Amino acid sequence: MAKLTLKDLELNNKRVLVRVDFNVPLEAGRVTDNTRIRAALPTIEYLLDHGARVILMSHLGRPKGKVKEELRLDPVARELESLLGRQVHKVNDCVGPEVEAAAAALKPGEVLLLENLRFHPEEEKNDPGFARQLASLADVYVNDAFGAAHRAHASTEGVAHYLPAAAGFLLQKEIETLGKALADPERPFVAIIGGAKVSDKISVIRNLLTKVDTLIIGGGMANTFLKAQGYAMGKSLVEEDQVPLAQELIQLAAQKGVKMLLPRDLVVAQEFKADAPHQVVAVNAVPDGWMALDIGPETARAYAGALEGARTVVWNGPMGVFEMEAFAHGTEAVARAVAAVDGMTIVGGGDSVAAVEKMGVAGKIGHISTGGGASLEFLEGKALPGVVALTEK
């Protein structure tokens, strides 16, 4: 990597300000899924092992610049304590005299967790004064929050102007893994793009069409592509205004020699409900008043077949309404097929990650991306502000 990383830093006795992504789900004051906290442990433990005084900062939820008691980071501090097996000091703000005193009092090998950054409106505005206040707490800055790297906020971008700024292990792994897939993939390179809306993924598809050998489309967005091919989609979700664009992307794939796979059959239902009557139909036989909620079994087999022999796979977005059991089979079939690939596999996006975890195959995936929006913007070929701001080696 051309940017500073943890291994480049002199850490002994240094105060290190680390931006982590501890935006985790809470219920009744407890962390219900600690995946993101665990993902930051390698960086935190490396810093502690090298005698650093560690100051952690994160956002949680969307308090919109005001203090919301239910979004305080105390439950996160408790969860982190149990994972680290050592005390985590917690303060009730992220700037100000109390915080400055706590940071100054830290000893090597100790951890301080600051309060939710988004209690201050200046965080999301990337206010230079606020960024300078955060930076004043430490000697060095480390960004390990890939999930927030696409945001130019005070804690992800602003702080890097005032301190030597390095990538943590998680951020480094995300950038190197996704970067290699896009810049120098082993081939065949297959991308699977799903989710409800084409409009969310247009730039991703356009960028991937210049890189992949095969592009597989599923989920609600496939309906818009099928409509673009002239099929009647009943009352399926179709983005009418995106139909011409879908036609353009189908033509672009043909021009670039990219094999674009669309569903051949669909699971359709009478309404958007878990227990709605449903049936499998060919794409040219969607009944009036029915809606497509998953890819059909023939399509699932075709998609799995297209993954056989792939050397690089990127998957982002489910094949159907994964949260309803009746319409989860397509996503589950793709999850199994991706896990069976003997090459580099990268899975990103909440539903795709949930699918590989639910199927118990997460351990067989080469890289599970922790950043939804950030990994999408990376796949679009965009520069991420949180990465750009890091110090060059």
From Swiss-Prot:
UniProt-annotated location(s): Cytoplasm
EC class: transferase
Major place of residence: cytoplasm
Entry-linked InterPro entries: Phosphoglycerate_kinase, Phosphoglycerate_kinase_CS, Phosphoglycerate_kinase_N, Phosphoglycerate_kinase_sf
Residues involved in substrate binding: 21-23, 36, 59-62, 118, 151
Gene: pgk
Keyword Cytoplasm attached: yes
Pathway assigned to this chain's UniProt record: Carbohydrate degradation; glycolysis; pyruvate from D-glyceraldehyde 3-phosphate: step 2/5
Kinase listed as a keyword: yes
Name used for this protein in its record: Phosphoglycerate kinase
Binding site for ATP: 201, 323, 349-352
Family that this chain belongs to: Belongs to the phosphoglycerate kinase family.
Keyword annotations: ATP-binding, Cytoplasm, Glycolysis, Kinase, Nucleotide-binding, Transferase
Record GO terms (molecular function): ADP binding; ATP binding; phosphoglycerate kinase activity
Pfam family name, one: PGK
CDD domains: Phosphoglycerate_kinase (cd00318)
Record text on subunit structure and interactions: Monomer.
One annotated Gene Ontology cellular component of this protein: cytosol
EC number: 2.7.2.3
PANTHER family the UniProt entry points to: PHOSPHOGLYCERATE KINASE, PHOSPHOGLYCERATE KINASE 1, CHLOROPLASTIC-RELATED
Highest taxon of the lineage: Bacteria
